[in-house]
Structures are given as structure tokens and as C-alpha cells.
A protein has these predicted regions:
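A short glycine-rich, Lys/Arg-flanked "PGG" loop and its adjoining helix->strand segment in the class I
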Residues: 41-56
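Short conserved AdoMet
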Residues: 5, 38, 52, 102, ...
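Conserved residues in the N-terminal Rossmann fold of short-chain dehydrogenase/reductase
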Residues: 12
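A short SAM/SAH-binding and catalytic strip from SAM-dependent methyltransferases
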Residues: 26-41, 61-63
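Short, conserved SAM-binding/catalytic segment
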Residues: 1-8
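Conserved class I S-adenosyl-L-methionine
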Residues: 56-83
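A short acidic, Gly/Pro-enriched loop at the edge of an enzyme's catalytic core
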Residues: 16-28
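Conserved Class I S-adenosyl-L-methionine
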Residues: 88-174
Length: 174
């Protein structure tokens, strides 16, 4: 509230069941969440329903190359590791987002965010990897020291690890 002032409000809710009347909102924002919806079409239908005719829907998502270097590093260490049980970008990503949004919105603009990270802290990277939603704990849990040494070696040899951030913003109008 301190940053936004009194002219703005936000609500956290289930996009698949929005408890507001038709044409209620000027703007709806979904920041890296659409790929988690059980029923994406229902969520998009609800979002479109509650937007005013001149309303704007902003949604962000990842692309298929997002943090690909982390996946490569982990697979090179142990090919059995999957950092995610679901391929989120197949559900809703930069590559298929416009197609998925087009039944609900007339104008769709994609703005890609060209960025990367340079990681030079093996322990921080290891902690991030261990926080992912895959099977890495099963295969790395008893090998953490070995895995950290593997990361430290890569960081030392390359003066850090450059990690691709493949993200973007869809701006949609009804």
C-alpha cells in the first residue's frame, strides 16, 4: 500500500473461479502463474470475462531456454535428475502463449525480456537447484558435497556461470 498509494488495489485469487461480475476490472495481471492452472482455458475465459471491454491483461511466462544452463549442468552430473516434474512452458510459455491467448483476446503483443544471470556462488546455486520441484533431492541428497565441488569447479573454470533468462510479457486487449 505504501508503494502503490490509494489509487490501486490488488487481490490474490483463483483464476479459474474469479468471484467478480462481468467487465469489472480495468487490468488483470498474472505473473508467472498461468502454467500452473489445472484448466488454462477456464482461467483465460474467467480473466476475459471480468475484464472491461477496454481492459488489459498482462501475463508473464518463461520460454523453453529459461535457465537451460542449470539443466545442462545437473544432467551432466547425473542424467537421471529432472528439476521439474512438469514442463511448464509446454502448458503456457513464450512459444505457445499467443496461440493459447488468441481465442480470448483480439490484440496480443509479446515483449521479450533479454537478460541473463552470472552466478559465482556454488552454494547459492546448489540451494536453488535443491528447491526445484523435481527429483533432484533423491539423486543429490547424499552427494551434496560432491555436487557443490562440481559447481565450484565449473564456476572457477569459467569465472562464473552465465545463465539464460528467457522470459517475456504478453500484453492482451479484448
Amino acid at each position: 500500500r505504501k508503494k502503490l498509494g490509494n489509487d490501486y488495489n490488488y487481490i490474490v485469487l483463483d483464476a479459474q473461479n474469479i468471484p467478480f461480475k462481468n467487465h469489472f476490472f480495468d487490468t488483470v495481471i498474472a505473473n508467472h502463474v498461468l502454467f500452473y492452472l489445472q484448466d488454462l482455458n477456464l482461467g483465460l475465459l474467467e480473466i476475459s470475462r471480468v475484464l472491461k471491454d477496454y481492459g488489459i491483461f498482462y501475463c508473464t511466462t518463461y520460454g523453453k531456454n529459461h535457465m537451460k544452463e542449470i539443466t545442462e549442468i545437473v544432467h551432466n552430473f547425473d542424467s537421471r535428475i529432472q528439476l521439474s516434474n512438469n514442463n511448464l512452458v509446454e502448458h503456457f510459455g513464450l512459444e505457445n502463449g499467443e496461440t493459447l491467448l488468441s481465442p480470448y483476446f483480439k490484440q496480443i503483443e509479446l515483449k521479450r525480456y533479454d537478460d541473463y544471470l552470472i552466478v559465482d556462488d556454488a552454494k547459492a546455486l546448489m540451494n536453488y537447484i535443491m528447491s526445484c520441484h523435481g527429483n533432484q533431492k533423491e539423486y543429490l541428497g547424499y552427494r551434496l558435497k560432491e555436487f557443490q565441488a562440481h559447481l565450484e569447479k565449473i564456476i572457477d573454470e569459467n569465472n562464473g556461470i552465465k545463465i539464460t533468462k528467457d522470459c517475456g510479457l504478453f500484453i492482451c486487449r479484448k
